[in-house]
Each structure stands twice: as C-alpha cells, then as structure tokens.
C-alpha cells in the first residue's frame, strides 16, 4: 500500500486520456490541464496501472477532455490489470455506438454529463447543435448493456438550469441512475454562472426518505421516492483533502498529486517500470493536502508496504 505522511492511502487512479473534446461547454475547465499535444499511450496506461495495482490501487476512472475520442479506448481497457472498479466520465455523445464494446472490454460503469433536459438549453451550454439526442441515446445504451449505475452529472448553472432539478430527479427515478448535482467551480471566469447549492440541498434534504453520508467526500446521498441524488460541492475544503485517496495521471503521462495544483507535476514518460515505481513512491511521499492545518499532519514519514 501507499500511505502518505497525512495517513491517506492511495487506492484510486484518475487518468486523463486526452485534452480533446467535441463539445465547447461554457463552464469547462478541462480539469486544469493545458494542451500538451502528446497523449498518453496504451502502453503507458497499462504501465502505471500495473505498478499501482501492486500497491493496492483497485479503482480507475478515465476522464478527459472527452475520453471516447480515443479510438483505442477499448484497447486501453483490455490492457488493464484486474480492478475492482473501472469507470469513465464522458459527455455521452459517442457512447451509444461504443457502449457494448466498452462493456466487453472491461468497463464497469459511466458518468455522463447532462446539464439540461431542454434541447435549446443543452445546445447553449455545450455550444454545439445536434448532440442532445445522442447523449440520451448514449445513456440508454449504457443502461441496456449494464454499465451501471450510470451517474448523471448536472452542473448547476445560475440563470440557466436552476429550475430543472425536479425534472432531472424524475428522469433518474426508478432506474439504475444517480443524479449528481454539481456546484460550479471558479475556473476561467465561468463563475458568473455560479449558483449556491446550499438552499437546494436543504430542499432536497427535507424531501428525502433517507440520507447516507459517503466517507471520502463527506458527501450525502439522498433517496427521494426511487431516485438517488447527490450534491457535489467544490472541493475547496480541508475535509475533502483529508479523505483524498486519489492519484491523478495527466494526458501527457505526468503524476499529478493534487487536483488543485499544477506546479508539482512529475513526468514518468520513457521510464522503466522500476523507475516509475521509484518516482511513484517519492511522489506519494511528498503529497500534501491543498487545504490543511499544521495540526492535521501525522508526525511520521510516509509508509510504503511492499506488495
């Protein structure tokens, strides 16, 4: 296992496969990445997954950009070592045609971005015409082949889709779908669309039949008459950092210890397995919460438990 100096065990990888996207969403921050022009290869994904698996990492999420733009995504999935959970976050526009093959290649589930059930609003948000029905078809395809639960990511946007929450809840009700209502983060001036989710969460809480708190994010899942709903707040808090168990890999094959920082990326491109392993151990050892207090630190060196 890999455990950093703050007692956080790394059990999950988040791998960005590309910076490219076929939509132009008005709020997109591309996970803080800059275009490098050199995408991570199948062999590189397999290498980092194989090495991390030796240390107890058993969960991988792929993201982008739009990861389904990678024509070799099926090959990437087949190159992975056994994992407890393999998922992808996608805009869904290319999912219908690929859902079955992705499932057969080892994908377990999908997150699909769907910010509006209104066609015109969807077009405004994505800045692309003719994509709305493709996303709905993609969700249906994911359900039909068992890429479940399908998580529906709805970014809550001021003056745009605030009135659609009930409609979205109705959409997921009674299906293996989970609605994630996401509070907008402040990236690249998009904060003009920010809408506070506090009052919304209180309203959902009052209607809920049951509420369950998830450990990592201290995020509550609400159950409302056959619908599952989560409120996802910006991760600018020490509680999220305290429970972070993820190591991120950029689309140009760099280790990214913290989602909110880009000044400590570590390239492992062109290295042997032994060299990558050594860099991985060192990177985890230097890993720190972005939001922290001095009293939060565990007074011991990082721990490496040999596989």
Curated annotation (Swiss-Prot):
Organism of provenance: Methanocella arvoryzae (strain DSM 22066 / NBRC 105507 / MRE50)
Record family assignment: Belongs to the radical SAM superfamily. MoaA family.
PROSITE patterns: RADICAL_SAM (PS51918)
UniProt cross-references to NCBIfam families, sorted A to Z: moaA_archaeal (TIGR02668), PRK00164.2-1 (NF001199)
Keywords: 4Fe-4S, GTP-binding, Iron, Iron-sulfur, Lyase, Metal-binding, Molybdenum cofactor biosynthesis, Nucleotide-binding, S-adenosyl-L-methionine
Cofactor dependence: [4Fe-4S] cluster
Pfam families to which the protein is assigned, alphabetical: Fer4_12, Mob_synth_C, Radical_SAM
Transport recorded as keyword: no
Residues annotated to bind [4Fe-4S] cluster 1: 21, 25, 28
UniProt-annotated binding residues for GTP: 14, 61, 89, 151, 246-248
CDD domains per UniProt: Radical_SAM, Twitch_MoaA
Gene3D superfamilies, per database record: Aldolase class I
HAMAP family: MoaA_A
EC annotation from Swiss-Prot or TrEMBL: 4.1.99.22
Protein name: Probable GTP 3',8-cyclase
Alphabetized InterPro entries for the sequence: Aldolase_TIM (IPR013785), Elp3/MiaA/NifB-like_rSAM (IPR006638), MoaA_arc (IPR013485), MoaA_twitch (IPR010505), MoCo_biosynth_MoaA/MoaC (IPR050105), rSAM (IPR007197)
Positions annotated to bind [4Fe-4S] cluster 2: 241, 244, 258
GO BP term, pick one: Mo-molybdopterin cofactor biosynthetic process
Catalytic activity: GTP + AH2 + S-adenosyl-L-methionine = (8S)-3',8-cyclo-7,8-dihydroguanosine 5'-triphosphate + 5'-deoxyadenosine + L-methionine + A + H(+)
Entry's cofactor comment: Binds 2 [4Fe-4S] clusters. Binds 1 [4Fe-4S] cluster coordinated with 3 cysteines and an exchangeable S-adenosyl-L-methionine and 1 [4Fe-4S] cluster coordinated with 3 cysteines and the GTP-derived substrate.
